[in-house]
Amino acid sequence: MSYQVLARKWRPKTFADVVGQEHIITALANGLKDNRLHHAYLFSGTRGVGKTSIARLFAKGLNCVHGVTATPCGECENCKAIEQGNFIDLIEIDAASRTKVEDTRELLDNVQYKPVVGRFKVYLIDEVHMLSRHSFNALLKTLEEPPEYVKFLLATTDPQKLPVTILSRCLQFHLKALDETQISQHLAHILTQENIPFEDPALVKLAKAAQGSIRDSLSLTDQAIAMGDRQVTNNVVSNMLGLLDDNYSVDILYALHQGNGELLMRTLQRVADAAGDWDKLLGECAEKLHQIALMQLLPQKSSDNNEHFSFLAKHISPENVQFFYQVIVSGRKDLSNAPNRRIGAEMTLLRALAFHPKFLTAVPKANTTITPPPSTPSAVENTGNYVDVPVLSQSIKSAYSQAKPNKTSIPNLASLSALDALEHLTQLENQERQEHKAESLAVVSETLHHIQELDEEKSHKKMTALPVREMTEPKPKHIEKPTLPSNAAQAPQKNSTEENSSDDNVEIAQDEQEILSADTYRWEWSNPELAKADTGVCPSDIKQAILKDITPELRLKIITQTQQQDQWADIVERSGLTGFSKELALNCFLQSKTDDEINLGLHSEKSHLRQDRSIKNLAEALSKLQGKDIRLTINLDDSNVTTPIEYRRNIYQALREKAQNELQKDSKLQILLNEFDAKLDVESIRPV
């Protein structure tokens, strides 16, 4: 027998087989059960959602030999003939190819004849909106008052094109497009029945590409089966649909979260090398931000999601998620106006990166512990008096700026791997702490002395204010600078512009903020040797270390401990299995074992792994390991027995908790946290 495509092979044979559309199935079933049958039904909806299939099922219920029923037997001659498409009293008409009024009149001439075999003569007109205006006019009278043995079933994808006179004569049922979850679950059921291995992410992509159509999803699945040699894998589906690797959008979100321009540009270059679609890339980023926002709002539903999303949902604030989403969605609209689509995508992501909190706080705010006297009066009082305002020299500004610790010169410990940051910064700190401390104390002491003398000079100047001026007079354009005290005059003098000021409240914090906010300001290492020592370590590279949960060394450690705890896990590792066969073995547990027979248990939720090819490969590997033929049996068993894959997860979680506890108790790390006012990101700690 020739191969039959999935869309035809799995066409629903009863109302219970229809996926979704419960609101329509219920209405039709109740009408058949109570014998309340209208003479004309209109089924509308997008392609591939079941309009024709439901119409045929309804015709089967009308003409079943056992009577009008919502549950036709499917075994009688009438049911089989309708299913095979050769029932003489079911007239199917394609309105797209028979649009002329002559075709409609020929059809209506046969309405007067009673059904030959069945109980009702059923006219199924597909794509009825394609009929001409004259054809609709010819159909009106018969559609309004047909013989009692005639039923009209109309199907259309565009009900808006139907005349209102036709709509008013029919019962209208609109079929909804199915969501991705319904489609992916239906595909999983079909592939399980067909004994075809599949990966869940692949089915999600197929369901998304189907855009609500069951028929489209089955056609795409047929294509994926052919491309994957009877295996539906994530890579095959991605290549078939021309989709980008999920890692691209995930890496971009990591880069935006970290404020890591290097990782962002490297990822965009990888997308360009793969000839990716830039609009799709931004769309995938927006979709993943939507998933992250949902996980933040409904964390109890995040257990089945990718671990990357769980990490990002915990570490990106909801405000930043919304901001990144808005920037990316707006940027997609600008792609058509960009010089080319790559530049448009890059500028969109760089715009999101430019507002990252890391860059907004890169210029440190003044944290002055020395506050000028609060009673300083305004330079121009409301009475019209004004006084000269002393201006700090550049040397004093520079000295005070150097005295303030520059926190931006130390990478944020919360964004680094705790172990790497501890080892790296401890060495630098031990070398520079004593020298820095002595130097900073000396500069602060000198600055305090200068500021105190300036305050005294300022207080003295208040007593010698200039004559009173009327409020109507314009304010002076310039304010003369008095001679600085002798201690301040001894410092190196630099050219200083005269400031236009209407206020005598010149505070150290304001002066420092002007310096730090200048366009030419960039933070630098206070000790050049410290900058040289840091050139070998890139903060973004250190951050990446914690994002990789399992290193090769850690994987080997987990596998070794699993072998020690479970006999079946040890057999699996020694057998040399790979691919689907190994995945099946790791999800099984040992029920019984003899010299020539092994019985395994498999939880029912993993039943899709029990494929003939995988079982055959597993049996061959076990026979080769034992040196003789082994009879292998795999039974579905939901007993509470730990499988090797669950052992691995438990061991990894235990190692992770141990690493977190050890770091939280580490005395050196506590010193670093206190010294730099840092916080330990416990969720980012990974075992090694």
From Swiss-Prot:
Where composition is biased (Polar residues), the residues are 484-499
Keywords, A to Z, come to: ATP-binding, DNA replication, DNA-directed DNA polymerase, Metal-binding, Nucleotide-binding, Nucleotidyltransferase, Transferase, Zinc
Recorded GO cellular component terms are: DNA polymerase III complex
Residue ranges for the region (Disordered) are: 452-506
- Which residue ranges have biased composition labelled Basic and acidic residues? 470-481
Record: residues binding ATP = G45, T46, R47, G48, V49, G50, K51, T52
Q: Where does Zn(2+) bind?
A: C64, C73, C76, C79
Q: Which GO terms describe its biological process?
A: DNA-templated DNA replication
Give the signal peptide as a residue range, or say none if absent: none
Gene Ontology MF, one: ATP hydrolysis activity
UniProt-listed Enzyme Commission number(s): 2.7.7.7
Q: Which reaction does it catalyse?
A: DNA(n) + a 2'-deoxyribonucleoside 5'-triphosphate = DNA(n+1) + diphosphate
**Any further remarks?**
As has been shown for E.coli (strain K12) and suggested for Salmonella typhimurium, the gamma subunit (approximately resides 1-430) might be generated by ribosomal frameshifting, leading to 2 protein products from 1 gene.
Q: Per its database record, what is this protein's job?
A: DNA polymerase III is a complex, multichain enzyme responsible for most of the replicative synthesis in bacteria. This DNA polymerase also exhibits 3' to 5' exonuclease activity.
Q: How does it assemble?
A: DNA polymerase III contains a core (composed of alpha, epsilon and theta chains) that associates with a tau subunit. This core dimerizes to form the POLIII' complex. PolIII' associates with the gamma complex (composed of gamma, delta, delta', psi and chi chains) and with the beta chain to form the complete DNA polymerase III complex.
Family assignment from sequence similarity = Belongs to the DnaX/STICHEL family.
State what protein this is by name.
Answer: DNA polymerase III subunit tau/gamma
Species of provenance: Haemophilus influenzae (strain ATCC 51907 / DSM 11121 / KW20 / Rd)
Instruction: Recite the lineage of the species.
Output: Bacteria, Pseudomonadati, Pseudomonadota, Gammaproteobacteria, Pasteurellales
